Amino acid sequence: MGFIKIINILKYFIIFNISVITIYCISFSARAEIMERTLKNGLQVILKKDTRAPVVTSHIWYKIGSADEVSGKTGLSHALEHMMFKGTKKNPGGIFSQTISKLGGKENAFTSKDYTAYYQTLPSQYLEEALKFESDRMSNLVVKKEDFLKEIEVIKEERRLRTDDQSEGIAYEQLYANAYANSSYHDPIIGWMEDLDHMTEKDISDWYDNWYAPNNATAVIVGDIDFDKTIKLVEKYYGAKKPVKITERVKRNEPYQFGEKNVSIKIKGKPSYIIMGYKVPSLNNKNIESWECYALSVLSGILSSGQNSRLQKILVREKKIASYADSGYSMFSRNDPLFLIDVNPIIGKKISIIENELEKIITELKTKLVTRKELERIKAQVLASEVYQRDSIDYQARVLGMIKTSVGDTKIIDQYTANIAAVTAEQVREVAKKYLVSNLQTVVKVNEKIQ
């Protein structure tokens, strides 16, 4: 269980020596292998057949995440994720997990800004067991005060370990809090400690009652399945679930940013660190052409995909001023995300030196076209990564669930290969010039004065 740190989870760039031509001919998914249905109660169902092994993964995705929370009530989605493992009247705490384990399977859950998801991966003959348990807790969760009081302390400790005691965690949190003045992406997924201190079991119960329903969920099942038998099982266990009235989500638009935002943090005993984010569009942004999102993905690859990427080559290998340098971008988000760049300086190297080199790298991307060789190499790596990770049924389910929940149309997956392949050097330069600019930028530096 846990919340998702976007810059790590959304890094799909893995290097492979695969012919670009070969990769371009591979579609991420074939429509013949996918069935999509919507039950009468509003539950969306996606089935994907993969018979290479007698295994299945069953996911349920709820369109509810930290972006739906309000000031003073942050962390509810993540806290509810924890409480979902405490059991129902029919299946008290622990029975679900114990059963899945005995059947040779595994289970877990994750929360993001846009969604909360639960999954089980197990031998395909036991799919019905997973559906039986998962459907039960969609509407029958028991939230006990004693369970909540114990679990909220676990969550607070998780926050201390992952955020409050980590340079990167604090910087990442402050980046979003400062970059977004009004957007619902302002608050951390795990919640502010002040809000966790005041959270109650009633807050959890109300959140559950308001959002956990078939008409706010997508069931994704991938693996060694028969479509007809599987859809009947889904109907059997979810078909009788009653929909609820879902509160209309009001998009909170960002006001114009007049210049670069800079945040400097001092943390005693911690190493220096810098992270910057630029406000960029997602595929849900109707004010831009979709090619910009694919060009931004390629741009991220140019910066950090492999040992020959700009950040690795210049900061880590040539200048030897950083031990780690990365970038990240996801076009698959409900609201406009951040294009991220983060660097761990070598001990003794000033952050100002890192900033100067980053400025040179970004300026070059704005003023010069990337070479055809570099562009094709990056495209090959991005696409090869997608093809490689398609071997995992869990990865396939995650992509389907994420896109269905955040964007709405899974056909985007089929178009991904062609859209990445179509990106030009001119388009990469154009998005760099348009988005990697000061009035879209927020920079957070940890211990910048340390030498």
Question: Each predicted region: which residue ranges?
Answer:
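N-terminal secretory signal peptides that target proteins for export/translocation
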Residues: 1-10
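Bacterial N-terminal signal peptides
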Residues: 12-25
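Non-catalytic beta-strand/loop surface segments
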Residues: 25-66, 91-126, 162-216, 240-286, ...
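Active-site SXXK
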Residues: 74-88
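Short, polar/flexible loop-turn hinges at active-site or ligand-entry regions and domain interfaces
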Residues: 86-90, 138-146, 370-371
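Short amphipathic alpha-helices in soluble, non-transmembrane regions
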Residues: 132-136, 233-237, 354-359
